[in-house]
């Protein structure tokens, strides 16, 4: 991957961020308390084909039971706080204060969205990502109750398909995401997929 600091680590304007996504680049930080931000352009990119998403049987059962209430864009601050508060296996997080502010601005102008799982009136899990054209760039997810974030991911894939999106970018792949059909594609192939996704517009 390539990585370099932006001109001003404290300011990432929405226009700059969207231009970066349009060219296959996204920002990260080393840790939550590190004020610096760097740009990342991986040699291999994680994607989940919307027509190749796999839902494990146990999760299918959870979805059928309707344990969680799914909401969209109702609590952005709560979702990014949940994602930034690493616990357990996710004790470290890359979401620092400049990144929080940057994505809050994107949310305000309609280019950042959340999928939220609510249980008994409380936010139990969720995810957020960036939309541009017909692409959704998944950023992070969290869970406070078993399967909450997985249900959000399953809902996201269904929702994106309904709304006409053609690309779900996960940035990297993990064993967890591979269970759902995530795969790695070389940078050139990814950039071709991204170019096609940016040719149209889909509404989240």
From Swiss-Prot:
Q: Where are the transmembrane segments?
A: none
| One Gene Ontology molecular-function label | leucyl-tRNA--protein transferase activity
Question: What is the annotated localization of this protein?
Answer: Cytoplasm
Q: Which reaction does it catalyse?
A: N-terminal L-lysyl-[protein] + L-leucyl-tRNA(Leu) = N-terminal L-leucyl-L-lysyl-[protein] + tRNA(Leu) + H(+); N-terminal L-arginyl-[protein] + L-leucyl-tRNA(Leu) = N-terminal L-leucyl-L-arginyl-[protein] + tRNA(Leu) + H(+); L-phenylalanyl-tRNA(Phe) + an N-terminal L-alpha-aminoacyl-[protein] = an N-terminal L-phenylalanyl-L-alpha-aminoacyl-[protein] + tRNA(Phe)
Instruction: Name the source's superkingdom.
Output: Bacteria
BP terms from Gene Ontology: protein catabolic process
Q: What is its EC number?
A: 2.3.2.6
Q: What GO CC terms are in its UniProt record?
A: cytoplasm
Q: Which residues form a coiled coil?
A: none
Provide this UniProt record's keywords sorted from A to Z.
Answer: Acyltransferase, Cytoplasm, Transferase
**Pfam families referenced in this protein's UniProt entry, alphabetically:** Leu_Phe_trans (PF03588)
- UniProt entry tagged with the keyword Phosphoprotein: no
Cite the InterPro entries for this sequence. Answer: Acyl_CoA_acyltransferase, Leu/Phe-tRNA_Trfase, Leu/Phe-tRNA_Trfase_C, Leu/Phe-tRNA_Trfase_N
Say which enzyme class the record assigns: transferase
Protein family (similarity comment): Belongs to the L/F-transferase family.
| General function of this protein | Functions in the N-end rule pathway of protein degradation where it conjugates Leu, Phe and, less efficiently, Met from aminoacyl-tRNAs to the N-termini of proteins containing an N-terminal arginine or lysine.
Q: Can you name this protein?
A: Leucyl/phenylalanyl-tRNA--protein transferase
- This protein's species is Brucella melitensis biotype 2 (strain ATCC 23457)
